[in-house]
Structures are given as C-alpha cells and as structure tokens.
Design a protein with these regions (language model features):
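Conserved N-terminal phosphate-binding loop of PLP-dependent enzymes in the Aspartate aminotransferase
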Residues: 1-421
Length: 421
C-alpha cells in the first residue's frame, strides 16, 4: 500500500474537504527552501510551509541544537520548575521587543498564544473588580482556530458553524485617512466596556494579505492608550522579519500591552507559542487571593526541545546575513511587482517586506472557494512550486534562504500563468 493510500485511510487533513480534495503529496525530506517528494521531485516552498519556516528546511544548526537538547532534557513540568532554555529564550526575546514588554508566558502554538493574551486582558479587569468584557478587533481578522481566537477573528467560513457560540466582539474596519476619525469615535463610545483591542499589525494574512498603513495603526493605538484600552499585537505571522523589520510593531511608535508569537519563533522546526506582557498586567495577578491566579497552562509548556530550537533560530535570525536576505527578498519583490502591475489580469498588488500578494482579476468571484484557487494551486505544483492562493489572491512568502534563481523561477511561472490561465 502506498503512503498516499495509507494516509487517506487514517488521516484527516486541516482545511481540507476530504471528499473532493486531491491526494496529499508525500514529502520525504527538506533542504534549504525546498522539499522533495517520494519520487525525488523538488518543490520550492514559496509559502514557508504555512508561514513558519524562516531559515530553510532541516537547517543543520537548528538540528544540532535540538539533538543536543534531546540528550539532556526532553521535557519537565513547568509549574514549580524551570530550565535554562526557557529562561534564556524569554530573556533574549524580551530584549529585542518594545521596552514595556517584561514577562513571557509559554504555550504550544499561535492559537494558544492568542488565548493566553485574551485571558490576560479579561482577567486583568476582572481582578480589579471592573466589568470590561468586550473585545475590539478588525473585520476579516484571523487569530487562530481555538474558540477564543475564533471569536476575535472575522466571521467567515472558518467560524460559520460556531458563530452562535462565540463571545461578543466589536469589529471595525482597517484604519485609513478617510475613516480614522470615525474609528476613534467608536472606541471613545465603547471605552468603558472594552477589555482590549487585538490586531494583526500592518498585514492581515489569512484575509488575503490585506495591508494598511502604520501611521493609522499608530493613531488608533494612541487613542486606545488615551482611553485605557489594552492592546494585543498578534505578531504570530508578522514577527521575525516578515514585514522587513524584526517585528511589525517596530513600524509604530505606540507600544502594545501584550504581544503574541509562534510560527517563525522556532524557525518553523516545531510548535511553540509565547505571549509577552507589561509589568502592569503581570502585577494585576499578584495577590494573596489565589482566585486572581492566571489559571492557564499546557502539558508541554516551555518544552525544552522547542526552546532549544527557538534559541538556535534566534541565533540565526540576529545574524547580519539574515537581515541582508530579508532586504534582498524585499527588493526583488518590489521589482517584480512593478513589472506586472499593469497586467490586465492583475487587479491589485501589495507588498510589505518579504510578503508579496497579487489579486487576480476575477470580476465578482473573489470567494475563498474560488475555482481559480485550485487551478492555480495545481498549476504551480506541476511546476515544482508550493503556492497556496487565498481564493483569487496569489502570495509569495519564502524562507529567507531562498536564492535569487529560485525567486526568479517563481516570478517566471507566475508570469506564465498570467498568459496561460
């Protein structure tokens, strides 16, 4: 029995309609920006395997550090115990975040990092005896698939079956010059009810790589600060260089109260989540009353092996060569965007840092379930490229180690698709 047959017999894949989806492709190894299937075919990973891989697949330095950790300590309970990797990772991450970030709370992935942030905000007010339970979020947001994360995400196919069960959220448009005054008024009118404002800084990933200007986010954040509304920056996707800076929040002068990280945190090696917060939020949980404890944790909280992977990734991320690669990819994206911007099939194009998105002209058919999505996905797979269009939106989000030749190959195949499809 083939690996595909064995898979289809026992596996339920994510975001996949198992009755109609094409069979999965068995991958046996990865190297650099590429993965290889069981027949030896190479695929350039143009989406960093769901936006997680930043240094390349099977990176020898990360693999070495993970292997070393496995022979020392694979796991230890994190309630009442600690270990070097967790402490060092928290120290090093906090050192490169906004200065107001003082504490790190570990969890298992991006969704759980968001859950922790939501709980911190809600209980912050609860511990002070204040009833502020409403959340503020952007329309079309995506923050994860656990229930709290779904609640603060825009209502869509991802949440449709559960909408009646999700807690109340006030959704607002992305800020622009035209609507910023109205958005600020909405916040002022709700300030006594709002627990927090959660946002994806500069880029809404799953919504279709929707991008907005830092100056209007900064103005919105300043207004939240004036109205004592806590802020959660979801840097799960945008963090670790994706937007051209180390973190997207570096584009604004205002600082969030809470920040959430995952995806690139371990270089894409394994799952790990971190939620950081200010001293003021941490202090709101200090009490002789044990009911004011943050009652949240995971079996694999601060797993030493995942921390080792994250520390190794941090070493690589802070190297000058990584920043140079980010700038190189950014410049190449800009050149390609200019080249295709007037093509009749390109409705819009947008780019921030290493993220390049192009909206294919499809008239009114812009659904996430657009048939064009499957056509393009299969077209690029046949060419040895992994691109997963979001409906009619093609985006490129490669590992930072991708070569110029590999990027140019992707660009060339997109141009070819524009002529053939």
């Amino acid at each position: 029995m083939s690996l595909i047959d064995r898979d289809l017999k026992v596996i339920w894949h994510p975001y996949t309609q198992m009755q109609t989806a094409m069979p999965p492709i068995p991958i046996v190894r990865g190297e650099g920006s590429c993965v290889y299937d069981e027949n030896g075919k190479k695929y350039i990973d143009g989406v960093s395997s769901w936006w997680v891989n930043i240094h390349g697949h099977a990176h020898p330095y990360i693999a070495k550090k993970v292997a070393e950790q496995l022979t020392k300590l694979e796991h230890v309970i994190f309630a009442g115990f600690t270990h070097e990797g967790a402490v060092e990772l928290a120290e090093r991450l906090l050192a490169i975040l906004p200065a107001n970030q003082k504490k790190a709370f570990y969890s298992d992935n991006g969704s759980t990092a968001i859950e922790v942030g939501i709980k911190m905000c809600l209980q912050y007010w609860h511990n002070q005896g204040k009833t502020r339970t409403k959340m503020l979020a952007f329309k079309n947001a995506y923050h994860g698939d656990t229930f709290g994360a779904m609640a603060v995400s825009g209502r869509s196919a991802f949440t449709a079956a559960f909408d009646s069960l999700l807690f109340e959220v006030e959704f607002i448009d992305l800020p622009t010059a035209e609507n910023i005054s109205d958005l600020k008024s909405q916040i002022s009118n709700l300030k006594s009810e709002l627990a927090c404002f959660i946002f994806e800084p500069l880029v809404q990933g799953t919504a279709g790589m929707l991008m907005y200007e830092a100056k209007y986010l900064n103005e919105l954040m300043a207004h939240c600060r004036e109205n004592n509304v806590l802020m959660i920056a979801d840097e799960i996707f945008t963090g670790f260089g994706r937007t051209g800076k180390r973190f997207a929040c570096e584009y604004v002068t205002e600082v969030p109260d809470i920040m959430c990280f995952s995806k690139g945190l371990t270089g894409g090696t394994m799952a790990l989540g971190i939620t950081t917060c200010t001293q003021a939020i941490f202090d709101a949980f200090l009490s002789d009353d044990r009911l004011k404890t943050l009652f949240h944790g995971h079996s694999f909280t601060a797993n030493p092996v995942a921390c080792a992977a994250a520390l190794a990734s941090m070493d690589l991320f802070l190297e000058d060569a990584t920043l140079e690669n980010i700038k190189r990819i950014e410049a190449m994206h800009q050149q390609f965007a200019l080249k295709i911007q007037h093509h009749p099939k390109i409705k819009t194009k947008r780019q921030t840092g290493t993220i390049l998105a192009m909206e294919w002209e499809t008239g009114n058919n812009t659904s996430y379930f657009s048939s064009l999505r499957d056509t393009l996905y299969k077209y690029f797979l046949a060419a040895g490229i992994i691109l997963r269009p979001l409906g009619n939106i093609i985006y490129i989000l490669p590992p930072y180690c991708i070569t110029n030749d590999e990027l140019n190959y992707i660009y060339g195949k997109i141009e070819q698709a524009l002529e053939e499809i």
